[in-house]
Regions:
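C-terminal domain-closing interface element
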Residues: 89-90, 383-426, 436
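Short glycine/serine- and small hydrophobic-enriched flexible loop segments
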Residues: 40, 44, 346-356, 457-458, ...
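Amphipathic alpha-helical scaffolding segments comprising HEAT/armadillo-like alpha-solenoid repeats
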Residues: 399-410, 429-442, 461-481, 503-536, ...
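Structural detector for internal amphipathic alpha-helices that build alpha-solenoid repeat scaffolds
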Residues: 415-430, 435, 439-442, 447-462, ...
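Conserved N-terminal/central alpha/beta ligand/cofactor-binding core
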Residues: 2-7, 13-23, 37, 41, ...
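Glycine-rich Rossmann-fold phosphate-binding loop(s) that bind the pyrophosphate
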Residues: 30-33
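Flavin (FAD/FMN)-binding glycine-rich loop and adjacent Rossmann-like elements that form
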Residues: 3-9, 17, 61, 85, ...
Length: 622
């Protein structure tokens, strides 16, 4: 056997003849949202289970990170029993303490052996099979043998030790989602929670993590001047971390286009919950959904493949939580608290079957697995909700969405054309749909004409170009109304589409938007006050930020598509970065380390890399 561990960021291995201090059938590392229910489910299904937690208590971000409310994620499963019990209890002032009590009772009842204050230090492997872990208990390193090991550390602490391909952040730029520090306060009437984006953080860089966390705490503590602060979360809210190459991969394009894997581990439920505002660097298909079709808050059932929790080529180890084999967009979606509870319960159930039957995780009796998780209620969620506008506060009824070009065509005459635009994009009869849209380009109603041009443009039809150019010449701050938040501006969408189907003659106009300081003085950028419908923050000029970033990305695309020299364009972006004027116009009241100015620098840095003939895209690799 060998032990493999990380030393200075590198995987190293050494031969050993281990003496086991503890043995179990299922070992779960991490007692957060997923790990707690994974351990409990494995024990209830007959396995001998050990649960290790690095911290002094359990609950993870749900308890220690103040993430106690629910956003999306399906109901169903064991967590509902604990929620109900905690709701009815009146023992503690702090709800998190109540929930923790019932989590501990659950583990005790199912027979899980819980060890807090244990830090995993190495993996024990035999060939391509993980046989357990080494952990430090504060005094010595102990060896634990297990038939199945579950990495429920959220950031893939164990997966990082494996020689598998790993990555983080989006494919272009490698940037991860912004982090938050959750704070609770009393505003004179109610106790409330705030979780505003606090900038970008590298969770694997100790110096960056410490510096950014302290800055975020300093910002949050300003609430003391206005309200009665109760507490700041002891855990930093990192939304995105390590991903790995698994036996299967969860891809956002498969979800958006309705492809389902043969064996589904469980069904998650969320909108494509991407934080941050630099949509100009997103993948084109994602932009089509989120920006052009204005479907930011459309919630989707997400089928997570069984193989997405299994590192490629390895046996005896799986993950539970947001560290999985997925792209950045899916990792951001499959992280809702309720879904983490349910995912943990499903993984724990499958792990117990694998351990007791001496079978690999992916080769267990799938029908038996389905029977167990469906009976427990943690597998499918509400099967009537495929895709639709859902409202987490339940203050409005669920609105199902059907993508049918003929049925949604009338929406192009309204302020809510998003479903019709995506239906046109994904229509099987592209030619006939495009011809119907082209007829609308002659409409006298500018709303209908502009909507039709956007739908035609997203299909790649250049007949949309004259109207898109007209839209931009008359650019304004009109925004679509499909969503309860994050609605997109029509002018921004037109700029985005020019990048896809525009021509060299569009370069001067786009350059004026990006590089001419007089652009910022236009009335459209100083008309709207912050609003939850499109952008609720006062930390930046949100419309100008979107126009400039999408304009810059469009310029680069046109240059590349037509094989134009990019040296002058690169120098123009370099000047913007060095002068710092752009980030000051975007966010004049922010510090350099705050999210808006940081995003402006990220944008310019990626534009410079994209125009460098010798440069390569900065894809996040771990």
């Amino acid at each position: 056997m060998q032990i493999i561990r990380l030393l200075n960021g590198k995987v190293v291995a050494e031969d050993v003849s281990p003496v086991f201090d503890m043995q179990c059938q299922v070992l779960c590392v991490g007692a957060g949202c997923a790990g707690t229910y994974a351990a409990d489910a494995a024990a209830r299904n007959g396995a001998k289970v050990i649960l290790l937690e690095n911290d002094i208590t359990i609950g993870g971000m749900h308890i220690l990170g103040n993430v106690r409310g629910y956003y999306y994620g399906f109901e169903g499963g064991s967590f509902e029993e604990d929620d109900q019990a905690a709701q009815e209890a009146n023992v503690f002032y702090h709800k998190a303490d109540q929930k923790r009590v019932f989590l501990l009772r659950r583990l005790q009842k199912s027979g899980v052996n819980l060890y807090c204050g244990y830090t995993p230090t190495a993996l024990l492997v035999d060939g391509n099979r993980v046989r357990g872990v080494l952990a430090f208990d504060g005094e010595k390193e102990i060896v634990i043998r297990a038939d199945v090991t579950i990495d429920a550390t959220s950031d893939g602490f164990l997966i990082r030790m494996l020689p598998v391909e790993k990555s983080y952040g989006r494919s272009r730029g490698g940037q991860m989602a912004p982090f938050s520090v959750f704070s609770t306060f009393f505003d004179g009437e109610k106790y409330r929670m705030v979780n505003r984006d606090a900038g970008y953080i590298d969770p694997y860089d100790c110096r960056d993590f410490s510096r950014k966390t302290m800055h975020a705490h300093r910002q949050a503590s300003n609430l003391v001047r206005e309200r009665q602060m109760l507490n700041l979360a002891s855990h930093t809210g990192v939304r995105e971390g390590l991903r790995f190459q698994g036996e299967e991969m969860l891809r956002y394009e498969d979800v958006l286009l309705g492809r389902t894997p043969e064996k589904v581990l469980f069904w998650a439920y969320s909108d494509l919950d991407v934080h941050g505002h630099l949509r100009a660097l997103d993948d084109e298909l994602f932009q089509t959904w989120w920006v052009v079709s204005n479907l930011a808050t459309a919630a989707i059932r997400i089928p997570v493949p069984m193989g997405a929790v299994v590192p490629k080529g390895w046996r005896g180890i799986v993950t539970a939580g947001r560290c999985l084999s997925a792209d950045s967009y899916m990792q951001n979606a499959v992280r809702m608290v309720r879904d983490m509870f349910r995912m943990g319960e499903c993984v724990g159930t499958a792990a117990a079957i694998a351990a007791l039957e001496h079978e690999d995780f992916r080769n267990i009796d799938y029908s038996r697995y389905l029977e167990k998780v469906k009976r427990a209620g943690c597998y499918a969620g509400d099967e009537s909700k495929e895709v639709g506008f859902d409202f987490p506060k339940k203050n409005r009824p669920y609105q199902p969405i059907v993508f049918d070009f003929d049925k949604t065509f009338p929406l192009l005459r309204t302020e809510t054309p998003g479903v019709a635009i995506w239906s046109a994009f994904n229509c099987k009869s592209q030619a006939s749909a495009a011809d119907r849209l082209a007829v609308l380009l002659d409409e006298t109603d500018s709303l209908c004409r502009y909507n039709a041009a956007i739908a035609l443009g997203v299909m790649g039809d250049q007949r949309a170009l004259p109207v898109l150019r007209e839209l931009l010449q008359n650019r304004d701050c009109f925004y679509f109304k499909d969503c309860r938040r994050s609605n997109q501006f029509r002018s921004v969408i037109a700029v985005c589409l020019l990048g896809r189907i525009g021509e060299p003659c569009d370069i001067p106009f786009l350059s004026e938007i990006v590089f001419n300081e007089k652009e910022f003085s236009k009335e459209m950028y100083h008309t709207l006050e912050p609003d939850y419908l499109y952008y609720k923050g006062s930390d930046r000029n949100f419309l100008y930020f979107d126009m400039v970033t999408h304009g810059g990305a469009a310029l680069v695309k046109i240059h590349h598509r037509f094989g134009l020299a990019t040296e002058k364009l690169k120098l123009a972006f370099i000047r913007l970065l060095e002068e710092g004027k752009l980030e000051k116009r975007i966010a004049p009241r922010c510090l350099a380390e705050d999210a808006p100015r940081e995003e402006a620098r990220q944008f310019l840095g990626e534009m410079i890399r994209s125009t460098d003939v010798n440069g390569k895209r900065n894809e996040g690799k771990a």
